[in-house]
Design a protein with these regions (language model features):
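Cleavable N-terminal export/targeting peptides
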Residues: 1-26, 164-166
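Transmembrane beta-strand segments of Gram-negative outer membrane beta-barrel proteins
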Residues: 21-37
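Residues that define the transmembrane beta-barrel architecture of outer-membrane proteins
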Residues: 25-27, 44-48, 79-85, 114-118, ...
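Repeated loop/turn-to-beta-strand initiation elements of outer-membrane beta-barrel proteins
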Residues: 27, 60-66, 95-100, 128-134, ...
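Membrane-embedded beta-strand positions of outer-membrane beta-barrel proteins
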Residues: 29-33, 52, 66, 87, ...
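Transmembrane beta-strands of outer-membrane beta-barrel pores
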Residues: 33-39, 68-74, 93-95, 104-110, ...
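Glycine- and aromatic-enriched membrane insertion/assembly motifs of diderm outer-membrane
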Residues: 42-96
């Protein structure tokens, strides 16, 4: 019982100290994995993706991001390797680590597949120290090329670093 109470107090202290992390002028870098068979669309049997993001807080709780990525798609897909470039905005809700993001990605593969994909995500920035986070997120990508075949829902797990610029 004492161990559980102690762990609860440590978790509460971690959440409280995360409140000042999303300030104007900070920069952000992140690497993440997506897919890992924890996503769904109409055609693929397996997919795995790597993504790198960089961002800047325009004001408290509001960040703009640029991302580069690579996706490998299994199954019957004729274009299994896709490169991704995109931009998005992220809003942190009430300084508690929960964020909402919206953006646009461009995916390209083998001169046969080009797709613009509006994307939305909901995630949580769990601080493991003052600047480093583990960031699980649920995302949705809407294909403008073929909704039923290429739109995607999935889970992303990232590691982020919030850097001070002052």
């Amino acid at each position: 019982m004492i161990k559980k109470l102690f762990m609860l107090m440590v978790a509460l202290a971690t959440v409280i100290t995360a409140s000042a992390q999303f300030e104007q002028g900070k920069t952000y870098i992140s690497a993440s994995l997506s897919g890992l068979d924890l996503n769904y669309n109409g055609t693929t049997k397996f997919s795995c993706g790597l993504e790198a993001k960089g961002g800047y807080f325009l004001e408290d709780d509001l960040m703009v991001l640029a991302n580069l990525g690579y996706n490998h798609v299994g199954g019957d897909d004729p274009s299994p390797d896709r490169f991704v470039v995109g931009a998005m905005g992220r809003y942190y809700i009430i300084q508690n680590g929960i964020y909402l993001g919206v953006g646009m990605n461009y995916k390209h593969s083998n001169h046969k597949y080009n797709d613009f994909m509006p994307t939305a995500e909901v995630g949580y920035a769990f601080f493991i120290n003052r600047t480093v986070t583990i960031e699980p997120a649920i995302y949705y990508e809407q294909s403008l090329k073929n909704h039923s075949k290429y739109s995607n829902v999935g889970l992303r797990l990232g590691l982020g670093v919030y850097l001070f610029t002052n």
